[in-house]
Amino acid sequence: SVSMLVLGFIFLGARSYANDVAVIESEMVATAKWVAGNLPSDVLIAAHDIGALGYFDSHELIDLAGLISPDVIPVIRDEEQLASYLDQRRADYLIAFPEFYPILTEGAEIIFTTHSAITLTFDQKNMVVYRWKTP
């Protein structure tokens, strides 16, 4: 019946929403709070997901998704050009899930990782703060 189908979708939607909130809290929010309490105030941070950073922290940000940094959009899918862009902008740190930017994060110095078990249960890697070495 339609009502059973609707109830099924409500249950699945609620579970999906709860999982999303758990990941956001244990990854993005935890990282943003760590950044706010541990990085110097004058550093420039590049990040793919800036929502929690913008809410919990006041550092200057480079938005690798292009929402507040639209100049990144032409190179958004090219990690080598993104690396040049971060060097040109003189970024100090990069915050990302490692699988988002395997070239940018390869060999980069890890400053912080969340170690959230929640994310690992979804077979994903934890969010990481990397030191970005500008030449």
Predicted stretch roles:
Residues 100-105:
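Short, charged/polar "capping" segments at the starts of alpha-helices
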Residues 107-119:
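Low-complexity, intrinsically disordered Gly/Pro/Thr-rich segments
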Residues 1-2:
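Membrane-interfacial entry segments at the cytosolic side of transmembrane helices
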Residues 5-54, 60-99, 116, 121-135:
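Membrane-embedded, lumen/periplasm-facing catalytic core of multi-pass transferases
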